[in-house]
Design a protein with these regions (language model features):
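Conserved N-terminal phosphate-binding loop of PLP-dependent enzymes in the Aspartate aminotransferase
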Residues: 1-296
Length: 296
């Protein structure tokens, strides 16, 4: 996220971060995903103790990091995060602007990973992106305090409760429920996409490829055996993105990670079509790099 942080006056005082739970990049030799998930969650406890538990109000995180490159945590990560925040009486905020409303095969991503947040932020998928709308869901732990201690909560936005946006959201959610899209992603098209993405690991340019529901990401790598990365100045991700656009494929470049977030209504046949284009663009990118002498 450093590229985005550089565009604003960040870091913000009194907000600190921990490392992302990315097994491929941060695991110790021979460390399983489950063991790594526990260790990665432990970074939060280390940070809490370094700051002082009495000074930490909340931990906020995306169930699956989206704009940071589609970083999919091990199954053990979020339950351990839950244990840690409960231990120190810290609020847990689930940032589900990307992950909610079927994206991971559930209405909300915290259902998939088995934790209970105190607050949930959402946007994007609530209207399927047809019109802007966002919101915050507040759990009893927070709501009860607001009711008992604060009376009215005088906070809002200029466009809160916009009738057109809310009407679109209701129509969208009714359609998603009618077509049972979260279940379809969870039981059918999501596993099919995962199978196809797994096959991308055989490509000479791909170091890792993963999906979770209907988000996916792959990392472009210079040498598979040594895991050597390309020089960032080469802009390999942007080169790949250019080939994607030329071939009618939308993939986002996050450094040298290529990520997708396809429509929830995508069929298996359309997934096959997308995978053909992804492989074609990877081949074209590899050819460019080989011709320029940047890889074997």
């Amino acid at each position: 996220m450093s590229g985005m942080h550089a565009q604003g006056d960040l870091p913000i005082p009194n907000i600190t971060h921990i490392e992302q739970p990315y097994h491929w990049d941060h695991a110790l030799p021979g460390e399983s995903r489950d063991d790594f998930g526990i260790r990665a969650a432990g970074w939060l406890e280390e940070k809490i103790l370094a700051i002082g538990p009495e000074k930490v109000a909340a931990f906020i995180g995306e169930p699956v990091q989206g704009a940071g490159g589609v970083i999919i945590p091990p199954e053990t990560y979020w339950p351990e995060i839950q244990r840690i925040v409960d231990k120190y009486g810290i609020l847990l905020i689930s940032d589900e602007v990307i992950c909610a409303f079927g994206r991971l095969g559930h209405w909300f991503a915290y259902e998939k990973f088995g934790y209970k947040p105190d607050l949930v932020t959402f946007a994007k998928g609530v209207t399927s992106g047809y019109i802007p709308l966002g919101g915050v869901m507040v759990g009893n732990r927070v709501a009860d305090v607001l009711i008992e201690k604060g009376g009215e909560f005088n906070h809002g936005y200029t466009y809160s409760g916009h009738p057109v946006a809310c009407a679109v959201a209701l129509a969208n959610l009714n359609l998603m429920e009618k077509e049972d899209l979260p279940r379809r992603v969870r039981e059918d098209t999501g596993p099919y996409l995962a199978q196809k993405f797994e096959a991308l690991k055989a490509h000479a340019l791909v170091g890792d490829a993963q999906t979770c529901g209907f988000v996916g990401g792959l990392v472009l790598i210079k040498n598979k055996s040594t895991r050597a990365m390309f020089d960032s100045e080469l802009g390999v991700g942007m080169r790949c993105r250019a080939h994607c656009f030329k071939n009618g494929l939308i993939m986002r470049a996050v450094g040298d990670r290529m990520i997708i977030s396809p429509p929830l209504i995508m069929t298996r046949a359309q997934i096959d079509e997308m995978m053909v284009l992804i492989n074609r663009c990877l081949d074209a990118t590899l050819s460019d790099l080989q011709e320029a002498g940047h890889c074997a």
